[in-house]
Swiss-Prot record:
Further details from the record: Present with 2370 molecules/cell in log phase SD medium.
Biological process (GO), any one: endocytosis
Primary location class: membrane
Extracellular-facing ranges: 60-62
Keyword Membrane set for record: yes
Entry membrane topology: Multi-pass membrane protein
Family stated for the protein in its record: Belongs to the DUP/COS family.
Record-linked InterPro entries: DUP/COS
Protein's UniProt name: Protein COS10
UniProt keywords, alphabetically: Membrane, Transmembrane, Transmembrane helix
Amino acid sequence: MGEEIRLLSSKGLETHSSFCLPEDIFRNRLTWLCSEIRNSGFWIWSLSWLPLAVWWGMASTWFYPLLTSVVLILALIAILPVVQIQYSKYTLSNQLTQLSKEIIKSAPGAYSADWDAVAIHFNSYLYENKAWKTAHFFFNGTDCQEAFRKTILEPAVLRRQNEDPRFSSIEILVPYTEDAVQVYFTKVNAQWRLIHGKKECKLTMLENVKLPKETYRCKLAWSCQRIRISFSPLDFLPDMSDFFICANLSPACLVSYWLIDIFFRMIDDFQNIRPKSMKVDDKMQYLSDIINEQGASPEKWDTIARKTNTRLFEKRVWKNEEFFFDGTDCQAFFERNFSSLLFSKKSASPRSLNVELWKYIQEAQLSCNYEPLP
């Protein structure tokens, strides 16, 4: 069966050299997504519903007719990205064998740059074989890596953990996945030895780096600043449909309901934005710092927080040197996003289980005599 599935298209390697990642073509993710929607044809389906939405809205007696029409139009527009994302997931689920073969060939690891070649080859394969209408399926190597971790790596490891029949189907229906997982683990282990074995450079200016607890009056002020920086109105565009659902309420109630809904969603995003912003190699360096400190005192966690804040700012992972508020926040982050998910037997979406880091998380726990926070 493996002989029948091509690793590359019939046009050969020279054709792939003409492809590049959407990250290098489009201005940002939004323009890329709009382009993908335009090429997919879903927007034509949506436009066909606009006259009906306007007519039904103007004829509605629930609320102001014009406002109802506007809300319906916005709801149709908001549906397009959702449909596009779901369709891309469906396409990916049918191409896991090809993705696994590309991984086996390129042997990527923790670093996102390792995945750029995999993303380019996979994008061009889908386009040339008419499985996708453009050569821009994955925006960059990071997206390709995360897709592998969620659709192949986590199910394979979870199946090993509990031998759950729900996960056994991936090995039966999708060949090469186990080999791809093994190749990935081998490369990650080699990169871990390089990261952890590298002699730590003394950060001479680390003593001058202030933690947010030393510059803000309280943690609430720091949290509000974080929420303000990370807030994006586009994230809440689909919530506009809530106005239509509750159109029989007064305008004041509608506004209050929407604001409260957005507030709680922002708090949830506030909890998840930090682990999402860290790539696998950033997490490996964070765990290496914990192991190297060899202790669980507040002072050592403060040191880890300073190192991480400085490093993530220098790598442009974070906009400022305020990733962690203090050592306690740093320790709580370790508990929530690493220790609590260790050897989990089920997915913790939207959080990553970090299954490739489990043995390093254990080592970090042992090095600092870790005890969960109360």
